[in-house]
C-alpha cells in the first residue's frame, strides 16, 4: 500500500461483511458493508471492490457450462469448483473425478483475473504493477492464490489473501474507529452484484444460482415456478430433482469434505446418477 509504484485494489467476499462487525462489538450477523468499505479506504487501498461482481460472472459461466454438458453429452455429474479446500481434497482422494469439476475459477480468482486483464487495460495499468488483495472467510484461499493455474495475465490473479480476523486486526492497527465511520459504497465497475452472488456464500447457494440461470438459458423464462428450497439449509447432504424444460436434472449439495466424499463414492459405485453436485470444503 505504501509503494507509490503499485496500484493496490481489494475485494471482499460476501460473508466478510456479515462477520466483521463482531470484532467491533456489533451483534453477530450485522451487515457492516458500508463501514467496511470506508475502513478499507482509510487503510489506503486505491480501489475497494466487491467479490459479488465476480460471483455473478462465475454463476453465468458455470450455468453455461452445465447447459453445454447436459445438452451436448459432456462429463457428468458436473461438480462445482469454487471451494479450494474441496478441490485439493478431490485431487488427492478422487483424482479420477477431476474431469467432472467445473472449469470455472472461484469468484475470488475470477475477480483477480478480470482486474488484471480487463480493468488494468481500461485504467492503463501494467498488470505487474497491480496488487489484488482478497478478504475471505476461508484460510484455504491462501493456498489457492499460489496455484500454478491461477495467472490469467501472466502474473498471479490474486496476490494476497487475508481472513476476516486479519482485516479486523489491520483496521485496529491503523487506529481506525470503526463504529464512527460513515457508510461508503464499493467502487465501480467491479463493485456491483446481484442477490444470486450474495447467496453464493451459503451452502446450496451456488447450486440455486446456477440452476436459476440454467433455467433461463434453456427455457427463455425465469425460474419463478420452480422451488429450489430443497438445496438450501444446514443438512450435510441434500438431494433434489427438477424439471428444466424437457430435461430432468438431479442435483446434490454436500457440506464438508466428509459428505462430499460420501456422495462421490456413490457416483463411483453407480449408486447415484446426479447431473450437478455442489460441494463446499467447510462444514
Predicted regions mapped to residue ranges:
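Iron-sulfur-associated redox domains of electron-transfer enzymes in respiratory
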Residues: 1-283
Amino acid at each position: 500500500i505504501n509503494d507509490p509504484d503499485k496500484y493496490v485494489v481489494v475485494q471482499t467476499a460476501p460473508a466478510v461483511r456479515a462477520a466483521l462487525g463482531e470484532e467491533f462489538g456489533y451483534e453477530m450477523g450485522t451487515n457492516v458493508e458500508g463501514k467496511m468499505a470506508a475502513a478499507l479506504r482509510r487503510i489506503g487501498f486505491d480501489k475497494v471492490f466487491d467479490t459479488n461482481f465476480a460471483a455473478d460472472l462465475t454463476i453465468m459461466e458455470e450455468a453455461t457450462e452445465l447447459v453445454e454438458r447436459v445438452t451436448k453429452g459432456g462429463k457428468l455429474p458436473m461438480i462445482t469448483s469454487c471451494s479450494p479446500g474441496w478441490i485439493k481434497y478431490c485431487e488427492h482422494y478422487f483424482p479420477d473425478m477431476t474431469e467432472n469439476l467445473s472449469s470455472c475459477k472461484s469468484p475470488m480468482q475470477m475477480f483477480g483475473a478480470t482486474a488484471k486483464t480487463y480493468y488494468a487495460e481500461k485504467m492503463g495499468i501494467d498488470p505487474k504493477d497491480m496488487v489484488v488483495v482478497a478478504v475471505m472467510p476461508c484460510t484455504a484461499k491462501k493456498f489457492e492464490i499460489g496455484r500454478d493455474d491461477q495467472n490469467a495475465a501472466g502474473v498471479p490473479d490474486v496476490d494476497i489473501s487475508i481472513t476476516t480476523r486479519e482485516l479486523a486486526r489491520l483496521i485496529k492497527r491503523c487506529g481506525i474507529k470503526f463504529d464512527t465511520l460513515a457508510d461508503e459504497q464499493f467502487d465501480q465497475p467491479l463493485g456491483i452484484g446481484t442477490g444470486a452472488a450474495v447467496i453464493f456464500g451459503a451452502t446450496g447457494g451456488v447450486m440455486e444460482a446456477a440452476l436459476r440461470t440454467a433455467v433461463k438459458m434453456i427455457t427463455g423464462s425465469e425460474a419463478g415456478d420452480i422451488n429450489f428450497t430443497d438445496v438450501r439449509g444446514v443438512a450435510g447432504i441434500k438431494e433434489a430433482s427438477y424439471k428444466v424444460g424437457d430435461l430432468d436434472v438431479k442435483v446434490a449439495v454436500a457440506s464438508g469434505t466428509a459428505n462430499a466424499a460420501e456422495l462421490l463414492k456413490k457416483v463411483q459405485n453407480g449408486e447415484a446418477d446426479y447431473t450437478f453436485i455442489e460441494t463446499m470444503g467447510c462444514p
